[in-house]
Amino acid sequence: MSKKKVLILSDHALSTSGVGTQTRHLITGLLEKSDNWTFRQFGAALKHSDYRTVIVNEDFIIKPIDGFGDRESLRIALATEKPDVLLIFTDPRFFIWLFEMEDEVHQICPIAWWHVWDNYPFPDYNKPLYQATDAINCHSYLTYEMVSEHFPNKTKFIPHSIPKNVFYPLEESETLNYKKQILGSDREDHFVGIWVNRNAKRKRPNDVLLSWKNFLDQLKIKHGHRKATLILHTDPNDSEGPNLLVTAEMLGIQDTIFFSRDRLEFDKMNILYNISDFCLNISYAEGFGLSTLECMQAGSPIIALKTGGLTRQVVDHRDGTENGVAIDVACKSLVGSQQVPYIYEDYAKCEDVADAIFKLYSMNKTERSELSKKVKDYVDSEFAYKSTIDLWDESLTELCANWKENYERWECKTY
């Protein structure tokens, strides 16, 4: 049987972005599963340092591009590569040009989409995009609930997942040694949190620092010390966000903050997750929240707002228990723009975040150990890498076999 060729438009699969790493895991997993697939990717970024084609292997080839491509480059790829599937994976606003030429794409192949939408209400303004797509695989359950209600026959839930050998618990002695190496021996007994996000408004970085200050105040009042460190894996000087160095100094917490500024490989990130007692995410709009899943796979609990894709991570949907602390939404704001006319933003109170941190701090060693096992078991069950790969294999196989029967071509009738 000849291999089916998939043309992917997403972040460069060898980049460190969430979309990039998930693209890499997906391609690698499908190639390891069977010999049925071969992949070509337009690897997106704002700018690349090297535009030479990357041949990972004969079935995994990446062409770096600025942005997510354009009509002409896609037309050339469709004509020369003749893919069996076009797979897109990122915010739909980057692909409006593609949806406008979906009739040209469908002369060659179907369109699959690994999709996420951050929040309610259902985006009626996206209906033309959904109608133009042949398979909508949602990586957050909230997105699946919204879209499947309107397009049940082509919508599936296929969550993000990570190979087990990427993030995993380290031995306790090894973790302690890394903790002393990275944070210093003077912080050996510190309670450690980690925040892994871009320093941008949506991620609420200043509110993270304010929440941390509130926690430290509680710690000082109730225990007489501030033996705690928050790792911020971000650029404190990112132009998209506030100057976190100045904010930390204003709040008087600069001595409790540790900035991890460099892009790190998986093994280094695994160490950071292991030396952390929890991972925090309070973004007001979060489609999935990959860092919290990564941290849970390393055995550390999370503190997360019950919004978007975070809800199914922080709350065990099977019994309602929490994989750390789930924070209730304190305020919903209906916002919008010309391209996205309406969508909710969800906000947590900084006081609730501080209380959540203190709740985890107050657990004894046995309780923390049990929680660590719980979060690791939950990831292994509900975000299993093998399951994600199997579901994608089934979805793409079914799509290649049946898409022409289900595709409704537009017809222009004149009278």
Placement of each model-derived feature along the sequence:
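Nucleotide-activated donor-binding/catalytic signature segment of Leloir-type glycosyltransferases, i.e.
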Residues: 241-263
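Short hydrophobic beta-strand element within catalytic cores of glycosyltransferases
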Residues: 301-304, 314-315, 322-326
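Aromatic "clamp/platform" in nucleotide-sugar-dependent glycosyltransferases that forms part
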Residues: 284
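Conserved donor-binding/catalytic core segment of Leloir-type glycosyltransferases
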Residues: 8, 186-203, 209-212
